[in-house]
Amino acid sequence: MGTGRLPNLHDSGAMTPPPTPTKGSHSKSDSASSLRGSFDSVRRGNAITYRCKPSIDEKETPGSTEPRHFPYWTTDYEIEVDHKGRKRPLGCGAWSNVCRATPRPPKLEGLAPLNTVPGVDMTPPVTPVHSRNSSRSEAQVPQIPSAYAVKEPCGRTAQRVLGDECRILSYLSRYPDAEKYIVPFYGQDTRTDALVLGLMDGTLEDWIQKDLDSLSEESRAAKLAHVFPTLAAHLLDGFIWISEKHCTHGDLKPANILISSTPSSATSTSTSPPHAVYTDFSSAILSTSSTSSSPVGGATYDFLDPALMTKASASTLPTPQTDLWSLAVTLLVLAIGSSPYSRVTSNEFMKKECIKQGTPLAYMRQGENGTRNGKRMDALEGSLGFDVEEWLGLVLVKDVMKRAGVDKWRAELGSGGAKMGLRI
């Protein structure tokens, strides 16, 4: 999404397989029947968990950048199409199209020998069984959801981009709490190079447009005040979690944050703030990888740190500090409902010059939406009893040396939350 892009820029309930079956104890039809039974459960809305061979699990150690491959020899999916058999993309980008897919059993008849699948030993598909003693963390156990989002590459360059993104998602997904902060990742399909991800309700950009801006100003203000502190705190915690893994996202914006309105925990209710996770790591950089290269993906101008827009910074790569700027602009957009540079959207050159000034808080009050933006910010602050604009201004200052670090910024939000009677 966005208007312009810069080039370059598992407990006792686990389900585990029995020992490798012999020809007399595990026939092909038995395996297919068991798999179909499992998928019937998925179609009823249940997620099932299965465990791969130990030789595969060893690669799931936190810190490993070994690409995670989607186990289509055990479970497969089918891209949803319209009545004419055409794929219906959920979203389209510079490098890929994302389509909705439904889990289904693998086509055993046409399955290639498993010893030809990268990283897989020659063993028949396993039947999920209940294990009483499971020591692996749930974060390392693949689950079959009710639906996938399949990110398919567009062209050869896109294959490289998705390959790099696969390594970063594989790396991050192996750490505990990954699914709290990043999109669920099931692996790369080696048949097509597509990335198989968890399906969410939509993006933060969609949520702002459909769930906030469609309301009356009074209702919008009330709903925003209810969700803003918790959502901002969660996104900041996710930002810190990713940064601690030595990863820089490189393209933070509402379109790259996925939202789920479904209660995510036992304490969640239908009125709880939506759960948000980061997605689209096509522009990300992993500083721990000795084989990492400059990202081919790009960043979106409206959310780009002005420090990356000078001639001297032409070859400069994104950093956690530039990511923090992008997150701050993202939260500003959440507050006011549009880009602070919306008044110059039609003039790309002028917009770039405005962004270089490093004063998005000043620009948000200008143009035909300026008055509305100011009223929305004032209403949010009045409802919360917290100076949101001043808080955003701790980061949204052009001079990098004068910006607050992420720890201070998070602490200030926590202090503000305490004044609101919130623990965030």
What are these regions (language model features)?
Residues 2-89:
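Juxta-kinase regulatory segment immediately upstream of eukaryotic protein kinase catalytic domains
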Residues 95-167, 171:
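ATP-binding glycine-rich loop module of kinase domains
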Residues 192-203:
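Conserved short submotifs of the Hanks-type protein kinase catalytic core
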Residues 309-325, 329-377:
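Conserved C-lobe activation region of Hanks-type protein kinase-like domains
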